[in-house]
């Protein structure tokens, strides 16, 4: 489950029109949501408040296995409607499998003029969190320099680092660091430059999207919501997001990228490359409200399935470490998504196969019913298509993963009344002495106004 600060940051990106998904670092986000989800450890509480649309506060406490906590503050230049934990869209609070819409060039902020002078300022976000009792301080500053350029500064200050530095044993110490990041997104290309002060590391990441780039329009949430309004009906005419038909196979787009980093201080370097294929977001009901007179609407609703299964296929390769990874993820039904990944090292011949799934639970089951029969008329009219009842609200998600080398993990995330709950367990089925390695419960509540 996303911490409140992460949820606010994502809301800030969405509110300012920045596409955080068009980054090389997020190339495998869809499969990671199923195969690399984080299970809570111990007992964790979190309470947050938004007294106004610009300022937020958050408090958290870990009761087990040790007692500690933190206090955080967030300020944004633009108003954000973050709602409350009781009415926020649940899928916005968890990492999940998604098929993202085609990338678009970010749009700039509308200009504001007063007495012949431009008075609008660039958007920014300020975040700070202090941990108790360690005194560690985390800070983040993000600002939009231009419609396609964003800068970020992240810093960590830990007073314990100076104490460990004086230790004669040279024990590994929590370090303080500051990192600068500059992101340039044009839709088709996205480049990120980073520099870390602690180890003097320079890095560059680049992602290229092949095919068409979406025009300026409203940002898209995911494939379950509409991606672009259809310009024509289903009677054999293409939608906006459709491309030329292909014989068989999946229809989608390809993205490829790479990263390179170098540290003169540590005398080390690294490089990796990756490629991703993702299907086009489907625009069938209930995402789009097709005309009721469409002759194909009844058959589409009766099946209730997209024209092609939402699918994401990724491959990564690190030549210096010899690591190769391939993942396949797909939504096999409305509420069930599955993923599989195979990792292999060409130097050590070590391999790992991981599988996982996420299943969404709902309050009620949506079903298709016909309209009530109308009174007899002298003139025959075509029968009305079946009506789609509202699909039940999402109440939670169950995630499970297993692999050939790691433990089996199971987690449930949901909403109880006005509180978000996350309950998970990690077990080692091969160990008779300690089959359960960890169990955790996380409770989160936040409100606005």
UniProtKB/Swiss-Prot annotation:
<dbReference type="GO" id="GO:0000002">
    <property type="term" value="P:mitochondrial genome maintenance"/>
</dbReference>
<keyword id="KW-1134">Transmembrane beta strand</keyword>
<dbReference type="GO" id="GO:0045040">
    <property type="term" value="P:protein insertion into mitochondrial outer membrane"/>
</dbReference>
<dbReference type="GO" id="GO:1990456">
    <property type="term" value="P:mitochondrion-endoplasmic reticulum membrane tethering"/>
</dbReference>
<keyword id="KW-0472">Membrane</keyword>
<feature type="region of interest" description="Disordered">
    <location>
        <begin position="215"/>
        <end position="244"/>
    </location>
</feature>
<dbReference type="InterPro" id="IPR027539">
    <property type="entry name" value="Mdm10"/>
</dbReference>
<keyword id="KW-0812">Transmembrane</keyword>
<feature type="compositionally biased region" description="Low complexity">
    <location>
        <begin position="285"/>
        <end position="301"/>
    </location>
</feature>
<dbReference type="GO" id="GO:0070096">
    <property type="term" value="P:mitochondrial outer membrane translocase complex assembly"/>
</dbReference>
<dbReference type="GO" id="GO:0001401">
    <property type="term" value="C:SAM complex"/>
</dbReference>
<keyword id="KW-1000">Mitochondrion outer membrane</keyword>
<keyword id="KW-0496">Mitochondrion</keyword>
<comment type="function">
    <text>Component of the ERMES/MDM complex, which serves as a molecular tether to connect the endoplasmic reticulum and mitochondria. Components of this complex are involved in the control of mitochondrial shape and protein biogenesis and may function in phospholipid exchange. MDM10 is involved in the late assembly steps of the general translocase of the mitochondrial outer membrane (TOM complex). Functions in the TOM40-specific route of the assembly of outer membrane beta-barrel proteins, including the association of TOM40 with the receptor TOM22 and small TOM proteins.</text>
</comment>
<protein>
    <recommendedName>
        <fullName>Mitochondrial distribution and morphology protein 10</fullName>
    </recommendedName>
</protein>
<dbReference type="Pfam" id="PF12519">
    <property type="entry name" value="MDM10"/>
</dbReference>
<dbReference type="GO" id="GO:0015914">
    <property type="term" value="P:phospholipid transport"/>
</dbReference>
<dbReference type="GO" id="GO:0051654">
    <property type="term" value="P:establishment of mitochondrion localization"/>
</dbReference>
<comment type="similarity">
    <text>Belongs to the MDM10 family.</text>
</comment>
<dbReference type="GO" id="GO:0032865">
    <property type="term" value="C:ERMES complex"/>
</dbReference>
<comment type="subunit">
    <text>Component of the ER-mitochondria encounter structure (ERMES) or MDM complex, composed of MMM1, MDM10, MDM12 and MDM34. Associates with the mitochondrial outer membrane sorting assembly machinery SAM(core) complex.</text>
</comment>
<feature type="region of interest" description="Disordered">
    <location>
        <begin position="282"/>
        <end position="307"/>
    </location>
</feature>
